[in-house]
Amino acid sequence: MDLILLQKVTNLGNLGDKVSVKPGYGRNFLVPQGKAVPATAANVEAFETKRAEYEAKASSILADAQSRATKFEGASVTICAHASTEGKLYGSVGPRDIAEAFTAAGLPLEKSEVILGEGAFRNVGEYDVVLHLHADVETTVKVIVESDA
């Protein structure tokens, strides 16, 4: 399935690129999310007439992500969870918990923006977490997991 990208998509391409993807990925994800349109002659022509508008929108989204990244620089959050005396958590701290903690601290964050390379945290400690705010913008924050007992 050939598509024209309306914004930058990680590991796929940039704005205006004509890409070929599997039909399910295009039909079920890229097109409904407004990230791409089918590469028909009419859509190619319509895209070229609105290219400046799409580029302006993409640059404003990037600027918003960069301003959000500056707010997160040096930020840290403490999450209290039930833990054993050895420091092992009863359960885990995952992306949803981290996003909720930052949102409660006044820094809005979606769980899909939290990248945990090694999975959820299962021990008490201090962790560096990568936030993927945009295809071009990533920042690192500190998450401290403490025992609530």
Curated annotation (Swiss-Prot):
It comes from Xanthomonas oryzae pv. oryzae (strain KACC10331 / KXO85). It comes from the Bacteria. Keywords: Ribonucleoprotein, Ribosomal protein, RNA-binding, rRNA-binding. One of its GO terms (molecular function) is structural constituent of ribosome. The keyword rRNA-binding applies. One of its GO terms (biological process) is translation. Binds to the 23S rRNA. PANTHER family: 50S RIBOSOMAL PROTEIN L9. This is Large ribosomal subunit protein bL9. Belongs to the bacterial ribosomal protein bL9 family. One of its GO terms (cellular component) is ribonucleoprotein complex. InterPro entries: Ribosomal_bL9, Ribosomal_bL9/RNase_H1_N, Ribosomal_bL9_bac/chp, Ribosomal_bL9_C, Ribosomal_bL9_C_sf, Ribosomal_bL9_N, Ribosomal_bL9_N_sf. The keyword rRNA-binding applies. NCBIfam families: L9. It holds the Pfam family Ribosomal_L9_C.
